[in-house]
């Protein structure tokens, strides 16, 4: 059966990322991995201060003022050693993350997609590089619906007879792409194009649930916009091109 389908050219080819694209993905994913571990260490230091009743009067415990506070701490062992070791590890992670981000910025300047992506609300160097690396070749998606489905940001649909029940998002597809789009949506939520709709959804569904739903909705809108931008090689526009099936704004 498979041989017959292949002979008739009815078996779709499997798309594989190039070695260069795999390298780009690895760099952006490694950065996210380091950022995650840095956040864990920072939270651990904050937890140690709270456990011993130390107040943190500054907004950034790891800025200049916070470092002076940490240097003067009088903790019992082993907590003091753990806090100092955590600070050293955070400094090392800061250095490594900075190196990766500088590489991403240098490489992204000549990338075919990243400068276009950065014209959209909420997308900077890091997010743009992550989204571009995870999407790969935009021509493998025949429509914005296909790209949105690939991201896993579409709701699950359970069908029974003539009844369709929609659940949470499917989370199919690369989680790093989903992270990049959600990160962009959070930053774009204050943009004039999206702010009113975003706030309206939050008020309608409640602050906590409404914020998450509004972010997912905005991430899907940005995904649609990204498909048009990369397919037509044009910067972000507030509205879809003539003849498009939907608006690009929320």
Describe each PLM feature range.
Residues 1-22, 26, 33, 66-72, ...:
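Short alpha-helix plus adjacent loop in nuclease-associated cores
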Residues 16-17, 47-50, 58-63, 104, ...:
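Short coil/turn segments at secondary-structure boundaries
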Residues 3-6, 28-31, 35-38, 42-50, ...:
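Short, amphipathic alpha-helical segments that act as regulatory/interfacial helices
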Residues 205-250:
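Basic, amphipathic alpha-helical segments enriched in Lys/Arg and hydrophobic/aromatic residues
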Residues 9-12, 41-42, 97-98, 136-140, ...:
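Short helix-capping/linker segments at secondary-structure and domain boundaries
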Residues 29-116, 176, 248-249:
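Glycine-rich, often acidic, oxyanion-interacting loops/wings at catalytic, nucleic-acid
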